[in-house]
UniProtKB/Swiss-Prot annotation:
It catalyses: Transfers a segment of a (1->4)-alpha-D-glucan chain to a primary hydroxy group in a similar glucan chain. This is 1,4-alpha-glucan branching enzyme GlgB 1. Monomer. Its EC number is 2.4.1.18. It comes from Xanthomonas axonopodis pv. citri (strain 306). The keyword Cell inner membrane does not apply. The active site is at residues 403, 456. Belongs to the glycosyl hydrolase 13 family. GlgB subfamily. Keywords: Carbohydrate metabolism, Glycogen biosynthesis, Glycogen metabolism, Glycosyltransferase, Transferase. The gene is glgB1. HAMAP family: GlgB (MF_00685). InterPro entries: A-amylase/branching_C, Branching_enzy, GlgB, GlgB_N, GlgB_N_E_set_prok, Glyco_hydro_13_cat_dom, Glyco_hydro_13_N, Glyco_hydro_b. PANTHER family: 1,4-ALPHA-GLUCAN-BRANCHING ENZYME.
């Protein structure tokens, strides 16, 4: 039998470095019919079972595990393998032809395969009547790729893959491997050096950390029951609809006996709470698989796999489905800017800078010690866009909040002179990222109508929410970081000094209509030594709670969608700790319960009155009444809806001094109802107010023929609307 084996081939197979196993293994034409070769390290014997049941014993080769024998020129066969522990009969992986179509490979190469995980990754399929899993991975510079797993003792010699040369995709159909199998890819770089075993970049399921293997996902699709939600989603998420977002970290919203809830447990507890509180959406901090829990998900590696920390992918689908059935939208934080350097991940995936830039001046982020995606490479931008579509289409997610957009837009982001590479025109803008974001948002709008894309963008980059056709980036909304920074700084000042910083309260209206905004009080504002939202407020306990209530009243009546991080809705006094659950016991304290009740009522007020949301992006929806009373730290403004909607008057006193008969001009006479007062006793306030209503007097003020003499409670926000 020695003439059947070339010594160089034997050595390459034995050392797991043969780059074209299909040229050697499997059945190939011979003078006597077909010569079948197999390499099954650890096997004692191998036979070929022909279609008629005849068994052809294969002869052992020059290396343990090598077997060869002559078969008839035609007909199928199966392998009967004798292992030390028993016998196995299976199809030969090397009996099957190429798996992926040329069209699939073309789309992958062009970065246009929107269902990328249906082509790459691990897909349970049936080929020529045989069930198994097709593995496929993009690694164009690898000299050899093998799939290893619990089905082959993690032995890279067992299942070397086929290279589809023009695309750089390696593929192999492995019979009898099904859902639940753990696997990785074992690659050699372009010069033959062995690389760390890699998790599948396109895996739909991952092993629970600290494990790093990928898992063959169950192909059974989730049976959705959210048709009603999906049919009305576009209207529910339109620009003139209310959007109040409750941002959560799934692992620390509620911990019972120190244990994370799974998706079903979270749905049982979170969904009724969110519905009762009146939020329209939940926003999940990243749920893509990530190796380090302390990154809160913002350094993901499994961009197609919901993290195993909270259960299976179908568990995540059930969570979204249940949210939709209760009328709650689901937004997911998504990270296309950078990825961690973990050896099992994307870093130097095939021995080259494949997903990242090769030059650290473009490819390494020193702030986070992460690698930066090369958005200018078609396959990489296509990989990221397909990840977005995976969550939007497969999991019915209603929107993505795109993380760290500013870090992507500017080549000199957080870099000193000489530490970055200018664009082709010598500037700082990252043209490749701009093109990527525009295409991402165009694809989302075309293929998932009604879904929303939200940018966390902290600079004045123009046109973030302008349409791509008009030169914009195409996002639906942008976080208003300027409003957040200015107003939080103002709210943190002792009231005696606020008169000198009045502009921080009013400046946001100068640019309020330059973009479509979300007002974010996010997790970033309650970590890294910043303290809690309540902890930022000055004064004694009474003043701190009153300040918080007034600030929330200002937030919920200011133009822009709302986002509030978990714990802020009841005045958590300490910074958020991702290793612990929220301090729910504080709701036994009437002060914290009062803040929670206030947020619940603000959400209902915000949804109930179209004037508070219908014209968030239209200057006609807002008018200052009092914007210049810095001495008293008072602001007053009108919110207006569409024709026929009642106007809403908002007045906020940011000092602890009660203002008596503070006169505010209003556009119409008659009685005005006080529909909200942050100083109400039910919220923990002193119960000072206007007795439920005020009658306008014929005394001109602020450009109006009539006015209201109001009592402004200390550190209080009141909202009034005319009767009828």
């Amino acid at each position: 039998m020695s003439n059947r084996w070339d010594s160089g081939v034997v050595r390459a197979l034995a050392e797991a470095r043969h780059g074209d196993a299909f040229a050697v293994l499997g059945a190939h034409p011979s003078d006597k019919g077909r010569l079948l070769r197999t390499y099954l390290p650890g096997a004692d014997r191998v036979g070929a079972v022909l279609d008629d049941g005849q068994v052809v014993a294969l002869d052992a080769g020059p290396e343990p595990g090598l077997f060869a024998g002559e078969l008839p020129a035609h007909g199928g066969y199966r392998l009967r393998i004798g292992w030390p522990g028993g016998e196995q009969e299976t199809a030969d992986p090397y009996a099957f032809g190429p798996q992926l179509s040329d069209f699939d490979l073309h789309l992958i190469s062009e970065g246009h395969h929107l269902q990328l995980a249906d082509a790459l990754g691990a897909n349970v399929v049936e080929v020529e009547g045989v069930r198994g899993t097709r593995f496929a991975v993009w690694a164009p510079n690898a000299s050899r790729v093998a799939v290893v797993g619990d089905f082959n003792s993690w032995d890279a010699r067992r299942h070397p893959m086929r290279l589809r040369h023009q695309s750089g995709v390696w593929e192999l159909f492995v019979p009898d491997v099904g859902p639940g199998a753990h696997y990785k890819y074992q690659l050699r770089g372009p010069h033959g050096h062995e690389l760390p075993a890699k998790a599948d970049p396109v895996a739909r399921r991952a092993e629970l950390a600290p494990g790093t293997a990928s898992i063959v996902a169950d192909p059974t699709p989730h049976q959705w029951s959210d048709d009603g939600w999906m049919a009305t989603r576009a209207r529910r998420q339109a620009h003139d609809a209310p959007m109040s977002i409750y941002e959560i970290h799934a692992g620390s919203w509620l911990r019972e006996a120190g244990v994370d809830l799974d998706w079903d447990g979270l749905a049982d507890r979170l969904i009724p709470y969110v519905a009762d509180m009146g939020f329209t959406h939940v926003e999940l901090m990243p749920v893509s698989e990530h190796p380090f829990g302390g990154s809160w998900g913002y350094q993901p590696l499994g961009l197609f796999a919901p993290t195993a920390r909270f259960g299976t992918p179908d568990g995540f689908a059930r969570f979204v489905d249940r949210c939709h059935r209760e009328g709650i939208g689901v937004i997911v934080d998504w990270v296309p800017a950078h990825f961690p350097t973990d050896a099992h991940g994307l870093a130097h995936f095939d021995g080259t800078a494949l997903y990242e830039h090769a030059d650290p001046r473009e490819g390494f982020h020193r702030d986070w010690n992460t690698l930066i995606y090369n958005h200018g490479r078609r396959e990489v931008s296509g990989f990221l866009i397909a990840s977005a579509m995976e969550f939007l289409q497969r999991y019915h997610v209603d929107g993505l909040r795109v993380d760290a957009v500013a870090s992507m837009l500017y080549r000199d982001y957080s870099r000193n002179a000489g530490e970055w590479i200018p664009n082709i025109h010598g500037g700082r803008e990252n043209y490749e990222t701009i093109a990527f974001l525009r295409r991402l948002n165009e694809v989302v709008r075309e293929h998932t109508p009604g879904a929303v894309m939200i940018a966390e963008e902290s600079t004045a980059f123009p046109g973030v929410t302008a349409e791509v056709a008009h030169g914009g980036l195409g996002f639906h909304y942008k976080w208003n970081m300027g409003w957040m920074h200015d107003t939080l700084h103002y709210a943190g000042l002792d009231p005696i000094y606020r008169r000198y910083h009045h502009g921080e309260l009013t400046f946001s209206m100068v640019y309020a209509y330059s973009e479509r905004f979300v007002l974010p009080i996010s997790h970033d504002e309650v970590v890294h030594g910043k303290g809690s939202l309540l902890g930022r407020m000055p004064g004694d306990d009474w003043q701190r709670f009153a300040n918080l209530r007034a600030y929330l009243g200002f937030m919920f009546t200011h133009p822009g969608r709302k986002l509030l991080f978990m714990g802020c809705e009841f005045g958590q006094p300490t910074e958020w700790n991702h290793d612990a659950g929220l301090p729910w016991h504080l709701l036994d304290d009437p002060r914290h319960r009062g803040v929670q009740t206030l947020v619940r009522d603000l959400n209902r007020l915000y949804v109930q009155y179209p004037a508070l949301h219908a014209h968030d992006d239209d200057p006609s929806g807002f008018a200052w009444v009092v914007g210049d009373d810095a001495g008293n730290s008072v602001v007053a403004f009108l919110r207006k809806g569409k024709r026929g909607d009642a106007p809403v008057l908002v007045v906020i006193n940011f000092t602890p001094v009660v203002q008596h008969a503070y006169r505010i001009g209003v556009p119409q006479g008659g009685q005005w109802r006080e529909v909200f007062n942050s100083d109400a006793g039910i919220y923990g306030g002193s119960n000072l107010g206007n007795g439920g209503s005020v009658t306008a007097e014929q005394q001109s003020m602020h450009g109006h023929a009539q006015s209201l003499p109001l009592l402004l409670p200390p550190l209080g926000a009141i909202v009034l609307t005319p009767y009828g």
